[in-house]
Curated annotation (Swiss-Prot):
Compositionally skewed regions (Polar residues) per UniProt: 240-253, 314-328
Zinc finger (RING-type): 18-57
PTM comment, free text: Phosphorylated. Homodimer formation is regulated by phosphorylation with only unphosphorylated proteins forming homodimers.
Disease: Turnpenny-Fry syndrome: A syndrome characterized by facial dysmorphism, intellectual disability, feeding problems, impaired growth, and a range of brain, cardiovascular, and skeletal abnormalities. Craniofacial features include frontal bossing, sparse hair, malar hypoplasia, small palpebral fissures and oral stoma, and dysplastic ears.
Species in which this protein is naturally found: Homo sapiens (Human)
Region described as Disordered: spans on this chain: 240-344
Protein name in the entry: Polycomb group RING finger protein 2
Record-linked Gene3D superfamilies: Phosphatidylinositol 3-kinase Catalytic Subunit, Chain A, domain 1, Zinc/RING finger domain, C3HC4 (zinc finger)
Amino acid sequence: MHRTTRIKITELNPHLMCALCGGYFIDATTIVECLHSFCKTCIVRYLETNKYCPMCDVQVHKTRPLLSIRSDKTLQDIVYKLVPGLFKDEMKRRRDFYAAYPLTEVPNGSNEDRGEVLEQEKGALSDDEIVSLSIEFYEGARDRDEKKGPLENGDGDKEKTGVRFLRCPAAMTVMHLAKFLRNKMDVPSKYKVEVLYEDEPLKEYYTLMDIAYIYPWRRNGPLPLKYRVQPACKRLTLATVPTPSEGTNTSGASECESVSDKAPSPATLPATSSSLPSPATPSHGSPSSHGPPATHPTSPTPPSTASGATTAANGGSLNCLQTPSSTSRGRKMTVNGAPVPPLT
């Protein structure tokens, strides 16, 4: 599963702090020539006596340097959201200042300049703030289309919506909310509880503060969330193939080699007198003991053929037999005294 890496706010401080005062940006203002940002009061006071950027020495407007700076609302919103309590403390300082100096005129007369903007209106949240949310079962687009008919006819008031309302800290994660729903509804472990915002599934590591910042929720009502229950996906386990050990033949030996390994070697076979009659000694029931020799004598099977017969009896193949040696080819053999031509 993909996991995010959380970083500390101190690692982002070089991008969120003013180089002139050493504090976090307040009314962040950017120089258009080099895009370096500073606090508004800091850069205005600096450009009264200097015509260069404090960080890179890029020259700004020679005669009217204030024309080269712009207010950066996006950067200021990022600073307020990343630094806990910064917006709340800044609004309190402004209210205290104008309370101590009531005759001071506020430029442009904005509520934020007077410190009269609340955190709820700005959209900033703190970790310990309580967030109101609504949770209901996710029906899907098809079910919503099917229920449009009864709602248009006025029968939707009779149907219970099943919406539940909760008050949770802003630092609570989606994983904790899913565990709460699982325990509340006694969902078996083989099913997965998934939390959604509209039709988009939420990451388990998202906090309610992250959802409020990522999605267009303006805090004009409870945070609308949905949930659904799905079967948990099982991970596929691949069959492990045994690793061939050293000295083991894994190259796919041929059938001839496998048969020859199982069959006994011709050199180790005993004498074939038990299975074949000896050329010099007639066997019981042979033609020489009871009658004249056969008209068409048959030559005895050589040792290699005998071993082949034994191999065939054991389920082997005759095509894998070794060729008789040269000594067996030149040997003269007789059957019952009759010469037999040498084998070729």
